[in-house]
C-alpha cells in the first residue's frame, strides 16, 4: 500500500508545520526537549499493556518489565514502599484522577467528593461518569482551596466519609493545596484518618516538588492515598501519558480476573499504550536526580525572571511558591492568540517548561504584553 502524491504532500506539509512550531509552547505545560530516537524501532510493533504489569498476560507483546521499573521509580519518588503500592502508566492526567476518584468511591460508596473551583475541568466529567456525590469548594485568590469553606461544606453535608481532591499545582494559577492543613482540620472535626480518602492531582508539580529543597507536603508520607502526574508535561513525551500511584490494599478491592487475557484487570482502560512506558523508562534512566534538579531550577528561575520583568513594567504578575506558572492580567485577544496563551476570566498565564533554554521567547511575549498594557492604559 502506498499513499497518493497528494496524501504524501499533506503529510510532508504537516511535518514542516510541526518542525516550525516544535518549541512554540509557552502557554501550556509541555516539555518539548525530549529525544526518543532510540525507541523509533519499536513503532513497528503493536505493543499493548492490557492488564497488570505485575502478572503474566497472554498478550505477549507488552512492555510490562519497563512499566514495572517506571512504577518502582515513582513509588520511591512519592515516598511509598514499592510492595505497598500499585499504579500504572495512564493516557494522561485525567485517567489518573479518575482512577483516584474511583478508588475513593469504591472505599466510600456513599461519600461526597470535595474539590475546589480551581480544579481541572476534567473532574466535573469524572463526577458525572462515576455518578459520585460532589461539592465544589471556594478557592482563595491564589487558587488554593478555601479550607474554611471545605470544612463548612463537609459539616453542612454531615459527611462522615469525605473524598478530598487536592490540587498539587492548579491548572491556571499553579496553586498547591495544603494537605497537612486539610488533615489537621479533618482531625479537629472528629473525622478519623481511616474515614476519608485523599487524592492528589500533581499533573505538573509532581515532577517539580521532588526536586526542590522546600517542597510543600504532597507524598504518601504526608498522608495521601493516591496521586496522578503527567508524563508529557515536565518529563516530555510525543504521546500524552501519565502515571498514577495508589496504595495496593485499596487497589486490590477493585481487581477483577479476566479470563480473556489470563490476567487481573485493575486499570480504567483495557488496552493500554505499551510505547509510553518505554519513553518514561528511557527518560528516568537517562536523567540523574541532579539533572532533574537542574532542569527544575532552570524552569523556576525562568518563571521568576518573567515575574520580575513584568512587575518592573507595572504589570501585576505573580506566581505561587515552587510554581513555574506565571499569572498576569489577560492581554488583548490579539496577544494571547499570537502567543497561544491559556486564559481564564481576567487572567492569563505563561509556563516555563524545560525547553525554554533562554529568555528569547519569554521576552518577546513580555514585550508584547507590556506594549498591549501601555496601549490600553493610555
From Swiss-Prot:
Q: Which GO BP terms, alphabetically? A: carboxylic acid metabolic process
Keywords noted in UniProt: Decarboxylase, Lyase, Pyridoxal phosphate
Q: What class of enzyme is it?
A: lyase
Residues that bind substrate? 120
What reaction does this catalyse?
Answer: L-histidine + H(+) = histamine + CO2
Task: Quote the catalytic residue positions.
Answer: 323
* Chain positions with N6-(pyridoxal phosphate)lysine modification: 233
- Annotated EC: 4.1.1.22
Q: Where is the signal peptide?
A: none
- TM annotation in the entry: none
Q: What are the coiled-coil residue ranges?
A: none
Gene3D superfamilies attached to this UniProt entry: Type I PLP-dependent aspartate aminotransferase-like (Major domain)
Cofactor field:
pyridoxal 5'-phosphate
One MF term in the entry's GO annotations: pyridoxal phosphate binding
| Known partners and oligomeric status | Homotetramer.
Q: Which HAMAP family does the record associate with it?
A: Pyridoxal_decarbox (MF_00609)
Family affiliation: Belongs to the group II decarboxylase family.
Protein name from the UniProt record:
Histidine decarboxylase
Q: Which gene encodes it?
A: hdc
